[in-house]
Swiss-Prot record:
This is 3'(2'),5'-bisphosphate nucleotidase 1. Its cofactor is Mg(2+). Binds 3 Mg(2+) ions per subunit. Transmembrane segments: none annotated. It comes from the Eukaryota. Gene3D superfamilies: 3.40.190.80, Fructose-1,6-Bisphosphatase, subunit A, domain 1 (3.30.540.10).
Length: 364
């Protein structure tokens, strides 16, 4: 399929411009948080910038979707109740939205504008879909990687389109991600990446803060590498230990033959779906997210956009048993953990996971 003939042209344009507008807003917020933290006026438990950002982004992106595709449903993280009960918070959210609309007014014809609080509440509440196996809906994570966002580190704006339980389009904006990620210490290149994937077409990289929606033919196609030698492999995993089992992941790397003297340099720790972007662009080979408890289930918006990015760049994604993730099961994935890897190594990774899980405590 050529880059110019895929059936999701309009969807991709709307998703791209909505994510670009939203990403610019989050970049400004994240940078201001870092400045505030440096001045010593941000308390550790102050989550208000995240709350404001989440609400503003969900309103902006949901409005763009409903303006262009009124019959589409949206699975979103927030509802507007807290905002409706706090007029000061609502004023802050509306003010941010109006400001970013003025700064990105060139996008208004495509993604629309919000000018009053009631429209903001309504747009946020469009995200109340339960998803499911039939029909068409979008999955949105407005600020994926909250802790990275607060640190001024990695976070992502993630939007995916799902049809009959299958992801067909994904767009991930990574405001703080540098183009080249070699290790935890070595990052270089342009700051801000936009990663897009369309089913049957491929995965692509472009500069996030470049104005407009470039056609895929002008974007950089990205592909996973096919490394299998343990000395060449790199693993991406989360920063926060509460999100995945780092100790189990260390055992898996040992089982795969990683050299204990170099494994630290071969592991890149990143918050959010940024991990999928680094993997899809061939800068890492394996993504491990082992469950920290037997009952935890992932939310679909945490993985939908990343899932298609990996498949369309030549990789494979599954749960801890290797089974593909099912995005038609409602708002959560009915499976444990997430493993992604290049196709050459995927089965070996799943075998290692299976062996470690058999020999460890039942919770893994």
């Amino acid at each position: 399929m050529s880059h110019t003939t895929h059936p999701y042209q309009k969807e991709l344009e709307v998703a791209t411009l909505a994510v670009k507008r939203a990403s610019l807003l989050t970049k400004q917020l994240s940078d201001s948080i870092v400045q505030t933290a440096r001045s010593g006026t941000l308390t550790k438990d102050d989550k208000s910038p995240v709350t404001i950002g989440d609400f503003a982004l969900q309103a902006i992106i949901n409005h763009a979707i409903k303006l262009n595709f009124p019959s589409d449903e949206i699975v979103g993280e927030e509802d507007s109740q807290e905002l409706q009960e706090n007029s000061s918070l609502a004023d802050q959210v509306l003010s941010l939205i109006i400001k970013i609309q003025q700064e990105t007014s060139v996008y208004n014809d495509v993604v629309g504008t919000l000018t009053d609080k009631n429209k903001v509440f309504q747009s946020i509440d469009y995200g109340n879909s339960q998803g499911g196996l039939k029909g068409r809906f979008w999955a949105l994570d407005p600020i994926d990687g909250t802790k990275g966002f607060l640190r001024g580190d990695q976070f992502a704006v993630c939007l995916a389109l799902i049809e009959d339980g299958k992801v067909v389009l994904g767009v991930i904006g990574c405001p703080n991600l540098l183009e080249n990620i070699v290790s935890n210490e070595e990052h270089s290149g342009v700051v801000g990446g936009l990663y897009s994937a369309v089913k049957g077409v491929g995965s692509f990289y472009s500069e996030l803060f470049k104005e407009g929606a470039e056609p895929l033919s002008q974007q950089k196609p990205i592909k996973m590498q096919n490394h299998t030698n343990p000395s060449q492999l790199k693993v991406v995993e989360g920063v926060e230990k509460g999100h995945s089992s780092h100790s189990t992941q260390a055992e898996i790397k040992a089982k795969l033959g990683f050299d204990p003297t170099t494994v630290a340099k071969q592991t890149v720790n990143l918050d959010s779906q940024v991990k999928y972007c680094v993997l899809a662009s061939g800068q890492a080979d394996i993504y491990l997210r082992l469950p920290v408890s037997d009952t935890y289930r992932e939310k679909i918006w945490d993985h939908a956009a990343g899932n298609i990015l990996i498949y369309e760049s030549g990789g494979q994604v599954g749960d801890v048993t290797g089974a593909p993730l099912n995005f038609g099961n409602g708002r959560t994935l009915d499976s444990k953990g997430v493993i992604a890897a290049n196709k050459e190594i995927f089965d070996k990774v799943i075998d290692a996971v299976t062996e470690i899980r058999k020999s460890s405590t039942p919770r893994v």
